[in-house]
Amino acid sequence: MSVKDEINKLIETINYHNERYYNQDSPEISDYEYDKLMKELISLEEEHPELKRIDSPTNRVGGKPLDKFNQIVHKTPMLSLSNAFSEQDLRDFDKRVQEYVGENVEYVVEFKIDGLSVGLTYNNGEFEKGATRGDGVVGEDISQNLMTVKSIPLKINDKKELIVRGEVYISKDNFRKVNEQQEEQEQPLFANPRNLAAGSLRQLDPKLTAKRPLDIFVFNMENIEEYDLESHSESLEYLEKLGFSVSQSYKVCKSIDEVIEHIEYWTDNRGNLDYEIDGMVIKVNNIKQRDEMGYTAKSPRWAIAYKFPAEKKKTKIVDIIVEVGRTGTITPSAILEPVRLAGTTVSRATLHNEDYIREKDIKINDTVLVQKAGDIIPQVLEVIKEERTGDEIDFKMPEKCPVCSEPTIRLEGEAAVKCINMSCPAQIRRGIIHFVSRDAMNIDGLGESIITLLLNEKIIQDVSDLYYIKKEDVVDLERMGEKSADNLINSIEKSKENDLWRLINGLGIKFIGVKAAKILAYNFKDLDEVISATSEQLEELEEFGSIMANSVVEFFKEDKNMNVINKLKNVGVNTKSLDNTGEKVEKIFEGMKIVLTGTLPTLKRNDAKEMIEKRGGKATSSVSKSTTFVLAGEEAGSKLTKANDLGIKVIDEERFLELLKLSSKDEVKAVLES
């Protein structure tokens, strides 16, 4: 086989496994085997750079770091849109449109994705370059970074020059996961999904961008006049055929009343989406009518952006409290006079750290503006200083831990104030909360209040004590009772069978989160092998550096930690990796996209999601034309409505449990079609 054929074969194989992993959630090979294929391809491409293809999967992992971004002059200016803030603004826009082209007007309404706007250029069927919007005329060349975004095709079946505009974003779920990783590594949290997406694309090192779970929706062919297309909606369908990701939510509207109705629906329901939108974009659909209307110096006359009302509210800080995390970090929070914000009642907001409080000059009794960063995390936006009365009180971070009274420290170069007493009850409590959490040992019935009771009653002192609890220890606790006590004991007992990665993550080793725990569990057959591994051995693992490796080694050197592990072993907690020895489950949902909505009678949402994913399905957060079926419980809401509108199959929990008993994907399809 020639080198060229070898490279082509490797690319074909890797692309196949990427499809299985990213789009079907049904991998056929291990991460280790996948990495071996990638390394082999990288090696061949480095030896024969003339044979490297534009669509090589190695372009997805990022190239060499840049010193700076070069500038690109946009062939077609990336204009901004004029804004509408009210129904009257939209009706005025419609009136202006009709003055140009008459009453026979059709509009396309799309989400205004809250991300970073980019332009993509393709030539001869290959991705050529990509740039930020910049000032609309000149942008920054971020081609290398854009090539790492998996939803951007690097090859398309179109030999013409094609210029596409899109919005790079990060989903709410992935935003939460990235911030959880930041917290585990004691790094600053990102304020909102847009900042994370924009910051990720502007990294000078593309390998850092490649690690961020970025996505894109494309929404415009900038050189549409070179194509035989009559409408904007046709262009979106064409882009989708080429392999671009197009938001399925766009709607063709026959009148401005229909436009307004669609906008009102999404104003109320945008919180159900797994990504941020900050408005809706309204465009004249007909291309000839657009040409008749033309442009102003700054924006097209045939489009307008409707901005959702700002999600900000005024309230008062009645107190500032601090909490101790499981790593000892002391975090301040503002206690607020309750206020309705983005659909929920907000009574507290994060203040991050001492520097944040100083920078914004925040005091107790201040009147402030609050918002939900990314509609997720309540935060203090600014102090309304003109409303100060003189009763405001300065806040100082505590010099002693509020729980154990040991001195606190702030290391040079760090923003966090910490309690370094490893026996601090607050750290122990947070550590146990982490141990039982969904991404660790996943023990149902052990909420924060129960854990606090168990600690206060001296029933437990560390995580291993959970497995020595008897029913009589807990049955008389507040809000417990016979049934709850039985459920709790059963849940604890069930968790003994968990895979090794859950235990490793639950132990709370500094810098080791879910992903690193899975890497350890895959590369070592049991916990004893992990414990005896040297830092040199650990550094050889993919994505492990010296800091993570040393953290693992140091953790297992501590007698206190080893005592806990020995107690866990003695009581029968699994310490072996089940990666290759677990029960085989047929992939009956392979390639299917399944949406969960509402409250199920007996199953928890996460359990149902795990059942779907274990069987090869993908549990998605929004209903679209590609959804296979919707699993609906009580109070299903807008997702159920949309599924019915699109003709998507809807089943209840009882039918879902019947599907789990089937032995093949074909059987599932037959049942769904019946």
UniProtKB/Swiss-Prot annotation:
A single GO molecular-function term is: DNA ligase (NAD+) activity
User: Which reaction equations make up its catalytic activity?
Assistant: NAD(+) + (deoxyribonucleotide)n-3'-hydroxyl + 5'-phospho-(deoxyribonucleotide)m = (deoxyribonucleotide)n+m + AMP + beta-nicotinamide D-nucleotide
**Which is a Gene Ontology cellular component entry for this protein?**
cytosol
Q: Give all residue intervals belonging to the BRCT domain.
A: 584-673
Which chain positions lie within coiled-coil regions?
A: none
One biological process GO term for this chain? Answer: DNA replication
- Where NAD(+) is bound, by residue? 31-35, 80-81, 110, 133, 167, 283, 307
- Keyword Cytoplasm attached: no
Q: What is its EC number?
A: 6.5.1.2
Q: Which cofactor does it need?
A: Mg(2+); Mn(2+)
The record's active-site residues are 112
Q: Give binding positions for Zn(2+).
A: 401, 404, 419, 424
The answer to whether keyword Mitochondrion applies is no
Report the Gene3D superfamilies cross-referenced here: 5' to 3' exonuclease, C-terminal subdomain (1.10.150.20), 6.20.10.30, BRCT domain (3.40.50.10190), DNA ligase/mRNA capping enzyme (3.30.470.30), Helix hairpin bin (1.10.287.610), Nucleic acid-binding proteins (2.40.50.140)
Q: Which Pfam families match?
A: BRCT, DNA_ligase_aden, DNA_ligase_OB, DNA_ligase_ZBD, HHH_2, Nlig-Ia
Q: Which UniProt keywords apply?
A: DNA damage, DNA repair, DNA replication, Ligase, Magnesium, Manganese, Metal-binding, NAD, Zinc
Free-text function comment from the UniProt entry: DNA ligase that catalyzes the formation of phosphodiester linkages between 5'-phosphoryl and 3'-hydroxyl groups in double-stranded DNA using NAD as a coenzyme and as the energy source for the reaction. It is essential for DNA replication and repair of damaged DNA.
What NCBIfam families does this protein map onto? dnlj, PRK07956.1
* Family the UniProt entry places it in: Belongs to the NAD-dependent DNA ligase family. LigA subfamily.
For this entry, the protein name equals DNA ligase
- Give the source species: Clostridioides difficile (strain 630) (Peptoclostridium difficile)
Gene this chain is encoded by: ligA
